[in-house]
Amino acid sequence: NLWIIKLLVLDLDGTLTNPKKEITEHTKNTLIKAQQQGVKIVLASGRPDLNGIAPLANQLQLDEYEGYILSYNGGEIIDWKTGEIMYKNLLDPEVLPYLYECATKSQFAIVTYDGEYVLTEYPEDEYVLKEALLNVMKIKKVDNFLDAVKHPIAKCLIVGEPTAWPSWKRRCTST
């Protein structure tokens, strides 16, 4: 057979998981069987790896079958069996003030991740709360986002009402 599958890359939300963000028993069993037959599984997502993807990787036993996690929209690739970070592409720290300015002048919240925390100046923001819930993370309020983010980061996210995005885009491209 010329079409032997060796690698299966799966997005999480709406692909691997159902609307409740769960892996069904049928899907889990099918993917474990595929791994037993030599198929490598990669879970790919914009989510952070620790809380956002790890529980799903563990359900699928990626550590036992040498699977991988591709987190932060490709910003980090981890061999889930060894824990080795195989690839890491961090956000250029010089772009952070620009992103922060775009977010604040458009009244959007900006977030990043630090271990089990979502860091933000706006812990009560509806979209920040959704991001934390999706990734099973706690929210840590910071007084000043730029002062708080002194560590290298793989991703930051600007969140807000989708209908306001066109005005956000105009403001940021004119900066």
List the predicted regions and their residue ranges:
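Short alpha-helical
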Residues: 22, 50-51, 163-164
